[in-house]
Regions:
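Glycine-rich flexible loops
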Residues: 1-157
Length: 157
């Protein structure tokens, strides 16, 4: 049985709290979304700590990124999520975080292409490093476009 929108809301809030507590996001970093059964996207808002969100803070957008439900402003990175959902019909949820170790690799220009941990290879495979794209612009979606069809995780430069 598919989850309800309310169940997805609870899940996103819980994931937000966990990634905040683990130090994978700070301040207003990161964003989370889920593709709903009707094709709309439930996502975190912009300018809000993922550790302190409530279910009412989440926003529903259509497939073009237009807000159709919710009081808050949509994440500036919604176009990145929409591109991933468009290119990957098998993807129904996205978590964009800033774990310190991953951020360090990205800042140093080092992709995670070597089999450092067996668990990472088994679950994610190669994690390529994209070129830099400014948040909320087509630079970002252009930077990830070539990698999305064949990778489940990306390091954003």
């Amino acid at each position: 049985m598919a989850k309800t929108v309310n169940q997805h809301r609870k899940d996103i809030v819980e994931i937000g709290k966990r990634i905040y507590q683990l130090g994978y996001v700070a301040a207003f970093d990161g964003n989370i979304s889920v593709r709903l059964e009707n094709g709309n996207i439930l996502c975190t808002p912009t300018a809000m700590s993922k550790g302190f969100m409530t279910e009412d803070d989440l926003v529903i957008v259509d497939s073009q990124g237009k807000a159709i439900e919710g009081k808050r402003k949509v994440s500036s990175e919604i176009d990145m999520h929409l591109l991933i959902y468009q290119l990957r019909r098998d993807v129904n949820g996205i978590v964009h975080a800033h774990p310190p170790c991953s951020t360090g690799y990205a800042a140093a220009g080092v992709p995670l292409q070597k089999a450092i941990l067996a668990e990472v290879v088994l679950v994610l495979g190669c994690v390529p490093l994209t070129r830099y794209g400014t948040t909320g612009t087509s630079e970002l979606t252009d930077a990830i476009r070539e990698y999305v069809p064949n990778h489940d995780a990306l390091l954003l430069a």
